[in-house]
A protein has these predicted regions:
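Short beta->alpha linker loops
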Residues: 2-3, 46, 68, 143
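Conserved GNAT acetyl-CoA-binding A-motif
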Residues: 1, 133-143
Length: 254
C-alpha cells in the first residue's frame, strides 16, 4: 500500500492499481448530485449484504479491489464504525451506493465509495453536498477508468473539483513464467515478444523470457534468445493483475 511503499518498492514491487482522488466544497457537489429515494447510516455489520451487493457490481471488471466474504465484510464494517460512519443510498430496486467516511476539522473524508450505477453515484454526491455548513471540503475516491468529469458543468475538472491520481495497490511477480503463462488474450493477437528481465532482489528470475500469443492464450517460457525489450521486475509487477478487462463507466447522462 502507498503508506508502506518505501519498504516494498526496493524489493521489486510495483503499483498496479490507481484511482482518482477528488476534493470539492460540498456546495459544488450539489450541482452534480441527485437525491436518492432513501438514505440511512449503518450502526452495525448486520446489513453487510447491502454493501456486498453494491461492491460486487462496482468492482466487477475492475482491477485492484479485494475479494470480501461475510467475515471480511463484518470486520471491515466494524473497524469503520469505530472511527467513522457508513452511509447507504437506495433506489427503487434496492441498495445503490455506499460511503465510508469520517468528519474531522470541517473536512469530510470518504475513504471508500462504491455505487451500482450513475444514479447511485449522484446519490452519494448529494449526500456529501448535504453537509454544507458542517464541513468545508469533501474528499473522495473513484476508479481511474471513470470519465464522468468530462460531463461536469462549467469545466469543473481541476477548477472547483480537484482531481488527481492516487495509487492504492502494490503487487510483486515472484515467478514470471507462472505469472504470465496461460493468461487469456484476444484470439486476434498473434506473435511473440522476447525481453530481458532484471531482478536484483530475486536474481534467479533474471534472464530472457518469451511471451507468445496463440489461440487466445499467452504462453511464457524462459530461454536464451535475442530479446526485443529490457525491463526490471517492478516494471512487470506494475502491470494489471487480476481482472484486466477495461470497464466502460455508465454514461453520466443515464
Amino acid at each position: 500500500m502507498p503508506s508502506a511503499a518505501s519498504f516494498y518498492l526496493p524489493m521489486g514491487f510495483g503499483f498496479y492499481a490507481h484511482q482518482w482522488e477528488r476534493s470539492a466544497a460540498p456546495e459544488r457537489l450539489a450541482a452534480l448530485g441527485r437525491r436518492a429515494e432513501s438514505c440511512r447510516t449503518l450502526t452495525s455489520s448486520n446489513d453487510w449484504k447491502d454493501l456486498a451487493s453494491i461492491y460486487r457490481e462496482y468492482t466487477k471488471k475492475r482491477n485492484g479491489w479485494a475479494y470480501r466474504d461475510e467475515k471480511s465484510w463484518e470486520k471491515h464494517i466494524d473497524a469503520q464504525l469505530l472511527e467513522g460512519y457508513i452511509a447507504v443510498t437506495y433506489d427503487r430496486k434496492g441498495p445503490s451506493g455506499y460511503l465510508f467516511y469520517t468528519l474531522d476539522d470541517r473536512k469530510m473524508i470518504a475513504s471508500e465509495m462504491a455505487f451500482k450505477n450513475e444514479a447511485g453515484r449522484k446519490a452519494l454526491y448529494a449526500f456529501m453536498a448535504g453537509h454544507q455548513g458542517s464541513v468545508d471540503t469533501c474528499v473522495w475516491y473513484e476508479p481511474l477508468d471513470d470519465h464522468s468529469f468530462r460531463y461536469w458543468q462549467d469545466g469543473a475538472e481541476h477548477t472547483y473539483i480537484k482531481n488527481r491520481t492516487f495509487p492504492f495497490m502494490l503487487g510483486r511477480v515472484i515467478d514470471p513464467v507462472i505469472a504470465f503463462d496461460g493468461l487469456p488474450c484476444s484470439k486476434e493477437i498473434k506473435g511473440e515478444i522476447a525481453f530481458q528481465l532484471i531482478d536484483s532482489f530475486l536474481p534467479e528470475n533474471s534472464g530472457i523470457y518469451v511471451l507468445r500469443a496463440e489461440d487466445g492464450r499467452i504462453h511464457a517460457l524462459k530461454e536464451d534468445v535475442f530479446y526485443d525489450l529490457k525491463c526490471h521486475i517492478e516494471d512487470i509487477s506494475g502491470l494489471r493483475l487480476g481482472s484486466c478487462l477495461l470497464y466502460t463507466s455508465p454514461s453520466p447522462r443515464d
